[in-house]
Every structure is written in structure tokens, then in C-alpha cells.
Amino acid sequence: MLSGQIPTRQWNTRRSEKARRLASVPVQGKVLPTGDLVAMLEKLIAPGDKVVLEGNNQKQADFLSRSLAEVNPQIVHDLHMIMPSVGRSEHLDIFEKGIARKLDFSFSGTQSLRISQLLEDGQLEIGAIHTYIELYSRLYVDLSPNVALIAGFKADRKGNLYTGASTEDTPALVEAAAFHDGIVIAQVNVLVDDECDLPRVDIPGSWIDYVVVADKPFFIEPLFTRDPRLIKQEHILMAMMAIKGIYAEHQVQSLNHGIGFNTAAIELLLPTYGEQLGLKGKICKHWTLNPHPTLIPAIESGWVESVHCFGGELGMEEYIRARPDVFFTGADGSMRSNRAFCQLAGQYAVDMFIGSTLQVDGYANSSTVTRGRLSGFGGAPNMGHDPHGRRHATPAWLNMITEPDPMQRGKKLVVQMVETFQAGVKPTFVEKLDAVDVAKASGMPLAPVMIYGDDVTHVLTEEGIAYLYRAKDLEERRAMVAAVAGITDIGLGVDARRVAELRQSGKVVYPEDMGIRRTDATRSLLAAGSVADLVEWSGGLYNPPAKFRSW
């Protein structure tokens, strides 16, 4: 042995351990028996494992999650769960039962209150709250999974998977395990005998160790469908201001819309109000977006050139199949979503992100984490920030330059579009984000801020627009936020003279300053007033889920 050389070590411990576990499973081939899944998981998962469980925004590997919740905690315990979206009750049952201990995630939605309670009770430990692309990236660095539990529509007996319109996170999750000696188990709705019986192959069988036919089709949530009947006049007024005061003002051609009625109103005003302003062909041409049904009228009216999707949306399958020039589809005609690539597109390739939040402080820092609610962020921190690595220019990006300096770079538009008060008369604008105290109480190393104020270029409320990128300093920035914060404590902290000065300089605009009459913000401007109208716009191709049908 050479001087200083370390003793011989074993270089394939992960591979050897995987082989040991696979050998312990009494099956031939790659198909696990549906009725024996719990027992199989007890052989394939070991205490302390890092386990990826595919809960996505829409698609849920729910048969696998329900089965994981039934394993014996004496056999499987202290798991470190890595879940993009925590959306089902059994996702947290495993912590109450002691099967899992630590959680790294991005979004929790309906489980946000329960996560907060489990954290307070000491039954769950949070690693970090991530943005999606950040969580995927860590799978290839320090969160390399021992096991990945994922979902697909169909598989053949060799493990080839068809994930189709709901491909979503699956490729990113699977590759991290498959190429670092992790075990990959896929639940599917349908098992076929041969690859030729699959519409296409989205994940090759060599990446998959086992498939199991689920006891019922995997759960999928139409998370991004908004009923136009619920769009209020305030949403329409804000949408008018967005189109005229931001989209047209800065020539926004590529963009992402966050979820909500505010952005749904914008989509439904493009064929009407946008048309009145003569903006077709000048704005909103390229989208990174889930296939929002409320975008159908704009597509049919010729506004939209392309849409790349994070995930699918129930009921939109046949409409997408019939519009391959707009959507990304496979040779079989069905859409191919990909959240990792769409998040990258939303980070580097779009001019603007516009979305809502639950709280905004005086400097435009925002968060969806509030007292008693640990909801996570999803993709907003990724798309709602200015990536300093960007090197291509567009008119909107260049329009953010405020100084004639040859070394100045452009900036992504990041717009927080909120009403000054949430439901229940809770102010959106607050002196201090709840996230600060949540971090202290939970022992987090940093406050769970969704979008930092220095990335926010505009704040849009029913009062008006604050063009924050034009602020000369933090004091003026705070005054601009206050000028559109209404009668919240933040809004009452600025006097009328200062607001008048900001309006005179064009750093803050109210509807009247843009030639928008508040009385014009009526539902008659919406291109579709109901889900039935969206179906009609689609030529009958859109097939909305039952809960959105009123006929």
C-alpha cells in the first residue's frame, strides 16, 4: 500500500444493497401482485431510507401512498420523505404512525394546516420548503433517493411506462433513483403485455424495477380549473389594469400565470378588452402554463402561439390533442407535460411571472406561509425571481433597465397581483410576514419567504399598480407599496401628498391614470361567463369534470 493510501473500501454499497432487496422479493419479472403490495414495500424499503413519493400538483401515486401508510412501523420507520406536493391525508398519516420522520417538500395545499400541527406536536421534522426545481435538483446532490414511488397511466410487463399528459415530475424523480442504484416502483392504471400496446413510451423500462396495477386509477385533481361564474368585478378591474398597465406597457410576449381568479380574468379579457386595445400579436404569445380552460377563448381567437405545460388538466385532453400547433404533444397525439423543463422555461425563457399570495409586507416580500398554515410555495419562488444567469434579450426584459449604463442588465417582470384584503377581512398587506414567526417557532434556519421584495417589479391591487422597479430607494419602495395597499395599516401609512407625487411621476398609477373607468369593469367583458361557455368556445372538445358542470 502506498504511503497515505486509504484501506480498500467497497465502492458499490448502494448497488449491493439494492440487489439484496430485489432478491428478497418473491416475484418473477417486474410485476408486483396488487394484493401483496404492503408486504413487498416492507421488503423493499428500509428504516431511514430517503423515499420519493410522487405527489404532484395534480397526479398522485395514491395506491402506493395508501399502501405505505399500512406498513408495519416496527419494520419500516424513520423514513425521510421527499414529496413535491403533500396533498393527501395518508401523506401525513405515515408521520403520525412513526413510519416517516422527516419531510422535504414544495407544496402542501389542502394539508397545510395538518402539517403545521404535526410540526408543532413534534411528529414531523421539516428539512426545507423548496421550489419545485430546487427539490428535483437536490435529488441529484444531497437527497439521492433509496426508493422512488411514482405513477403512470399504463405499463407493459418490461416496465415501459406511458405517463402521457400527466408526465409532470415523473422523469426527474425516476432518473435520480434509477441512475444511482435506487429502487423505482410505479403504480399504473393498466398493464399491457407488450410495448406496442402502449400509446408511446415516456419512461423506459430499464429505469423501472417494478410495476403494480393499482386498485383504482390514480387520483388526479383539476387544480387549475376556474369557473368564470366566480370571477368578480374586482378581478376584472385588476385584469384590465394588468393588460393595459403592464402587459402592453412592457410588451410582455412570454409569460407564466399563477393560479387564481385574477389571472383567469386576464385570460378571459384578452379576446375582448385586449382586442379593443389592438394588442393581439403584440403580447401574450408564448406561455409556460398548465392547460387552463380559461385560456381556450384566447387560443381560439388567435392570441396564443405556444403553451408548454407543467402538468395536465382533467377535461382538456381532447382539446389539446386537436391543437398540436399550440401544445407539446407526442406522435400518439396526447400531450407531454414536464414540470422540470417547464419550470426551467419559466425561470429563464419568459418575460414575466404574475401571481397571487397570502401576505405582502411593506417592502413587497411575500409568502403563503401564515400562522397555522404551512402551505409551501410550489413553483412561485422559481418563476417569481430574476435569474441573473439569463443572457438573451427581449423587449420586456430590456424595458426594466432604468439607467443608461452599458453594463446594466434587463430583468424579468415579477408581478404580485393581490386584493388588499383576503376573505374574512384579513389584510394582505402586513407590517411583518407571519413566515418570520413561523420560522422562529419551528426552528427553521430562514423564514419561508415565497418571493423576496427585491425581485418584485410590480404590485397590482384593486387600487392600482406600483412600478417598484422604478423606486430610487427602499423608503420610496415602501411608499409605493403603501400607495396601492388600500385601507390596510400599511396603506394608511402614506399621506395623500406623497401618493399624488408618486402618481405624478408615474411610479404609481391608478385606473383613472390609465384611462380605465372602474364602472367599465363588468362581467360583460369576459369572453366566457361560465364553464359551459368554455365548452362552446372549444367546439365541444373540452370535457369539464362533473363538479364544474351546471347543466
Please identify what each model-predicted range represents:
Residues M1-W551:
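Conserved alpha/beta enzyme-core scaffold
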